[in-house]
Amino acid sequence: MINSSNVNFKASLVSKTTVLKRAENSFKTIPQEASFIKLSLNNSYDNKALKDIKQSWQHPFAESMYFDFVDYLKHIEEGNIFALTTQNKGFKNIDPEKVLGLVEVLPNGKTGQGIFLDYILKAPKNIQAKMGDFCKIGETMLNNLKNFYKGEKILLFSLSDDSIQEFYRRNGFKQQEIGSNLFIFRPTSK
């Protein structure tokens, strides 16, 4: 697991990344710079941004992430919420309108057992790639998580939807057994 001795009281940049943006009046995409950030559990601005997202997205996962953020995660070492955003600086004040997606992770048992991906959620306006301004948001968030937790296995329980489960397979996750909703990403050893 990642061990950081620095205490941070604002969202911090994990990595610069790229998302694909749909060109005007076209289904062609163009790359746009984005940021993958980790929210600070001790920051009132991050709390407010997540609360605003919960209210504007009106999704039960966003609501669960918000309540986990303000209460539950403070008691769990290595529990984090990450955001993919088109905001590229000024992470003290996250602009909820620029957040493309959120991911909540928890430790999976003891240190060294990997992480558990509790929630992954795209902004509602980008759920359908054909209709949204941005696409490949989920893939971008997963790739950034894999880099952040380099060498760790990532576990998740998928919804029982064939297209969602296929999304995880395309991104390197293996279904544990046929009919199971448990998927695991195991990093390749070098």
Regions from the PLM with identified roles:
Residues S5-G132, K136-T140, N144-K190:
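Non-catalytic substrate-recognition and accessory regions of acyl/acetyltransferase enzymes
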